[in-house]
């Protein structure tokens, strides 16, 4: 995109490159407010690395314990492969440690594949079973369950380099946010995700909003937003 401005003489003149960059950075610093599963989400400016954190109260935590089918049923928003598969969502959209494939251990799902949530002192232990002996274990953490852990309260979880996680409970929902920053040559950007999980009709309802922003030196700026909601039925219903 090429921006132009007019001088008093009426001649068109290209806007200086530095001004284009400043305009792009101003856009990049923007923030907004959205609603995800009836919960207000205030997105902070992301250029300065601020994490997305919602209010949290342990008394408002839902019980996510249960075993759920891997394949979800769309309920609202856009279809998204990264959300409609529960194990893929946890492993790659949220980048939870312990759940992605490794060189020694690959996910080979069968129709019996499932994901189990078990209550744990620090949140919910997640066990993904591909139905033929392959098991991956991770943790959906409670933000308030950081006592005794060598990190600041409300701090990000140990995860992949460049990935931040925060989690907690509000309005009967468990929320988790993930932020991944990237840089390549003269370009930089960020992926941000917030997800709210709650039990519904014996299954698990997952509501997600994802944002991506990138900026380069042309200068150019791009952004994208996807909202999805999927319901994952109880594993027993598939038998």
Q: Each predicted region: which residue ranges?
A:
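Phosphate/adenylate-binding glycine loop and adjacent helical scaffold
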Residues: 188-195
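Amphipathic/hydrophobic helical signal segments and adjacent flexible N-terminal regions
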Residues: 31-121, 177-179, 200-239
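Sec-dependent bacterial lipoprotein signal peptides
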Residues: 1-31
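Predominantly extracellular/secreted and cell-surface proteins with exposed
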Residues: 105-184
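A short, structured loop/turn motif at beta-sheet edges
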Residues: 65, 165-171, 196-204
């Amino acid at each position: 995109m090429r921006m132009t401005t007019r001088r008093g003489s009426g001649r068109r003149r290209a806007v200086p490159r530095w001004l284009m960059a400043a305009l792009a950075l101003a856009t990049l610093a923007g923030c907004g407010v959205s609603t995800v599963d009836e919960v207000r989400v205030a997105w902070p400016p992301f250029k300065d690395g601020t994490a997305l954190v919602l209010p949290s109260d342990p008394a408002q935590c839902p019980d996510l314990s249960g075993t759920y089918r891997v394949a979800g049923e769309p309920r609202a928003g856009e279809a998204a492969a990264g959300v409609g598969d529960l194990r893929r969502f946890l492993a790659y959209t949220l980048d939870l440690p312990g759940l992605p494939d490794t060189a020694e251990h690959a996910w080979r799902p069968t129709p019996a594949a499932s994901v189990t949530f078990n209550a744990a002192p620090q949140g919910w232990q997640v066990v993904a079973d591909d139905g033929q002996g392959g098991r991956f274990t991770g943790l959906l953490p409670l933000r308030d369950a950081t006592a005794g852990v060598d990190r600041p309260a409300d701090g990000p979880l140990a995860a992949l380099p460049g990935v931040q996680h925060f989690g907690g409970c509000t309005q009967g929902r468990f929320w988790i946010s993930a932020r991944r920053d990237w840089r390549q040559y003269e370009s930089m950007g960020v992926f941000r995700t917030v997800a709210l999980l709650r039990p519904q009709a014996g299954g698990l309802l997952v509501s997600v909003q994802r944002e991506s922003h990138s900026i380069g030196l042309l200068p150019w700026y791009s952004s994208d937003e996807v909202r999805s909601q999927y319901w994952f039925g109880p594993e027993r219903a598939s038998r």
